Amino acid sequence: MSQPPFWQQKTLAEMSDSEWESLCDGCGQCCLNKLIDEDTDEIYFTNVACDQLNIKTCQCSNYERRFELEEDCIKLTRENLVTFAWLPPTCAYRLIGEGHDLPRWHPLLTGSKAAMHGERISVRHIAVRESEVVDWQDHILNKPSWAK
């Protein structure tokens, strides 16, 4: 009998760096800019993607240098993950952290990102490049029902 996959055996804190990185499905949702109301701290979701995001592949074009190139790039870590209530319910970090399994379309289960793109989980069908946007308020999305 084969061993269950690592995400069913370990907590996020117990995962190796490579296991942690492999959980990311590459949907690009983390790379969409959010606006925060300074008075209420409410988060507004936009379809404005960081210029480092390759919208077609939903991959960072400069992953190794992303933090030096984009000062607002957010690094999800085991330590700060609990502060990111805005992560979508499809996010593997959120799912595993809440004790759930990976969705059937996740690349670790399917071997590719095709199913994820087919389910329209990725941002490639809605994202626009940050450098092409004049007024970000024109790009605010309806607040997802799962967003806190």
From Swiss-Prot:
It comes from the Bacteria. InterPro entries: Puta_zinc/iron-chelating_dom, UCP006173. NCBIfam families: PRK05170.1-1, PRK05170.1-5, PRK05170.2-5. Belongs to the UPF0260 family. This is UPF0260 protein YPO2083/y2228/YP_1926. The lineage of its organism: Bacteria, Pseudomonadati, Pseudomonadota, Gammaproteobacteria, Enterobacterales.
